[in-house]
Amino acid sequence: AGGIAEMAELGPEVRKTTDKLDSVGNTTAAIAKGFAIGSAALTALALFTAFAEEIAKNPKLTGLLVDGHLVVNLTEPGVIIGIFLGATLPFLVCAFTMEAVGKAAFEMIEEVRRQFREIPGIMEGTGRPDYAKCVDISTKAAIREMMLPGVFAVGAPLIVGFLLGAKALAGFLAGVTASGVLLAIFSPS
């Protein structure tokens, strides 16, 4: 809000009000991020607990239990592979997401340039831009570009579980939980 007020060359009284609004917005965003991180961490732990309970129900996998608790030897190669694969998945999804944002931004830039070229009067404020087209580009790009990260997030645990087994999947879930929570905490936005 403050930046818009400054670009519009509004008076200092307006800027004073928008600075307060910016401050409230930034505080709200920081609090919401904390809640999002906390809920994601609890959800990941709940999924890991559900995995452990399913192990307990499966007679073929009860060898992973000691006194009713899931126990995994961290020195086993399959478990180590699972941990490393799990620790890399949040970074892979993050990379795909950043690439998706970049592609969507370039599509938006091309559309805005096209509108400046083809719609007379936009720069002077007499012509009306096609806002709906920009919203349409954003929506379609978001859906299209986020499919691959979604497939990785859903498919990776299945692939690890079926190809490497339950012990590797336990390591995978531990790795993805630890690195995912840390990535969420230390990512700037």
From Swiss-Prot:
Key words of the record: Cell inner membrane, Cell membrane, Ion transport, Magnesium, Membrane, Potassium, Sodium, Sodium transport, Translocase, Transmembrane, Transmembrane helix, Transport
Protein name: Putative K(+)-stimulated pyrophosphate-energized sodium pump
Species: Rhizobium radiobacter
Organism ancestry: Bacteria, Pseudomonadati, Pseudomonadota, Alphaproteobacteria, Hyphomicrobiales
Regulation: Requires K(+) for maximal activity.
MF terms (GO), sorted A to Z: diphosphate hydrolysis-driven proton transmembrane transporter activity; inorganic diphosphate phosphatase activity
Its biological purpose: Sodium pump that utilizes the energy of pyrophosphate hydrolysis as the driving force for Na(+) movement across the membrane.
PANTHER family (alphabetical): K(+)-INSENSITIVE PYROPHOSPHATE-ENERGIZED PROTON PUMP
Gene: hppA
Major location (coarse): membrane
EC number, UniProt record: 7.2.3.1
Recorded topology in the membrane: Multi-pass membrane protein
Family: Belongs to the H(+)-translocating pyrophosphatase (TC 3.A.10) family. K(+)-stimulated subfamily.
Quaternary structure and partners: Homodimer.
Group of enzyme by EC: translocase
Subcellular localization, as worded in the UniProt entry: Cell inner membrane
GO cellular component terms, semicolon-separated: plasma membrane
Transmembrane segments: 31-51, 78-98, 146-166, 168-188
Keyword check for Phosphoprotein: no
Cofactors (names): Mg(2+)
Catalytic activity entry: Na(+)(in) + diphosphate + H2O = Na(+)(out) + 2 phosphate + H(+)
